[in-house]
């Protein structure tokens, strides 16, 4: 049985970049495992641990084979007919092979294959010891790490994320002889920089985590995270509040500390007059603090910082955190008060001076386009067009506020607050903020109907603009954020169950963008001509039907639908189901969703596979047809019972599903289609479609054409075929 030993590799460094640490740790761990695997060294992955702190990267494996497995090799020699001469003496071929193997030819074994009997020499190659291979494995692992900005230090030419100061390599109780980046491996690690600033001797890998903990280092990120969350929640409870803990903030703090300790802090209540989102943004993003909320979710004057030490004077640590945050809060309060002096309406007047795009006019022009689209969408989903107009008119005003200039993430949020203060209706104020949702992957869509209207109009205009001026995404470049906007648009429609004609909306958006580009061309060409926008609208806003415009709308539609591929894949929807619906190009994305749901249920039926295969066969037959197919089926030309049987069954299904299809009850329609399997099977078993009689052939093709069209009334089901 193979002997196994625990393995510990720890690379000690100066503080690693917080954002790079997770990837560095993962790559280091995976690189070591991959190096062992490439060399055939057995590893028990069940207890493998990737460990890290800001000052170290470590790999801890509880069971690693002490050597590579033995390798059994076969060296093949000559066949018998060439191994001996006519007198039965060994030829030079046999003697040379034996000499190469270092044995007498008489000791060679014989085997038989398809060509006859031949000589073979079997050897056992012992595996190399793991400790001899580890230095090379470590070097490879480090070389493969994704270091964003490698650096040199001292007089060395080594490159790494930060200077390397120590290296621990223990295999069992023994130190592995190695030198990496000028540092020799040993058993000496380091404790916490301030709480235990001295060497830590490790007897073996097994007690690594416990020994480091005694030196005030929690080397397991999961343990640090659990401690951080537990302490934050406990401190917040002490003051009767609830801590706001976001995954992003916790992940950052975990990679900033080795020995976390929660510290309760506070700020002056006067700062609570500022929109709480600005204060929260400052605490979380800029300082990595955790705000404390009351039972209603409103910000209190308390917050929690995570120190990297256990201080004897916690109050002094708290004062330091409070001193850091006060200037930022003072700035936010100043910006807020300055914005209140001018008001939301005055901010909007400056949109005329801000260029949205050289070919698309100003932000005020964009607002005008969004306003028209919002008015068109609103009545389709039961929203007052006047409210839609009002919220669109105010939607971009906060972009000219001091607050948003300082905190760009608060666009929409600031507008919400300023609209309420200005006396706007609550639903209008909420919609200004709501329209930005979803802001990121996994975020919720807009909550209010009015916010959804504005969000749809905004994204439609952005998409139409991006495509009109040639700013389509390429690779990882997406300057207009079109991919994000397309998915946000699609999610809002689908998750809100809006049965909107997407192509009509894209058509309207494209018309107004075409109008905008025309106006800009005229502005540049005729600077002295003061033509009114109203006159230009009469001249240019009439929809121009052209092949180019139709192609652009189709391109936009396809771009939006393609964003849904990943959206549904994340929900476990098979690609074949998605392709089946996408081929039909439903104009309503909510209709697309319902068809996709129905296809999922249909695919579970026992008849689904057979019908999918049949439909694929029908398409192939029709594609290869070399004669003109009649528009209708002539039942008088049938000469086989299977033909009439199929037509009767098809007509029955069409009649029975007409109402369900009109009501878009696609599950019912597809369930009904399952009844066609027996007559379809009988038709293909007993009827020769490509009959020599051209009239019979054409009529049978017409029957298959009608059948194929109805089989695809919900989705192109041949995609379900295996």
Curated annotation (Swiss-Prot):
Superkingdom classification of source: Bacteria
A Gene Ontology BP annotation from the UniProt entry: arginyl-tRNA aminoacylation
One Gene Ontology term of the molecular function aspect: ATP binding
Enzyme class: ligase
Record-linked SUPFAM superfamilies: HD-domain/PDEase-like (SSF109604)
GO annotations of cellular component type: cytosol
Keywords, in A-Z order: Aminoacyl-tRNA synthetase, ATP-binding, Cytoplasm, Ligase, Nucleotide-binding, Protein biosynthesis
Pfam families for the chain: DALR_1, tRNA_synt_2f
Subcellular location: Cytoplasm
Principal location: cytoplasm
Keyword Metal-binding: no
This enzyme's EC code(s): 6.1.1.14
Catalytic reaction list: tRNA(Gly) + glycine + ATP = glycyl-tRNA(Gly) + AMP + diphosphate
Record carries keyword Ligase: yes
TM annotation in the entry: none
Family: Belongs to the class-II aminoacyl-tRNA synthetase family.
Assembly behavior: Tetramer of two alpha and two beta subunits.
NCBIfam families in the cross-refs: glyS
Protein name per UniProt: Glycine--tRNA ligase beta subunit
Annotated organism of origin: Xylella fastidiosa (strain Temecula1 / ATCC 700964)
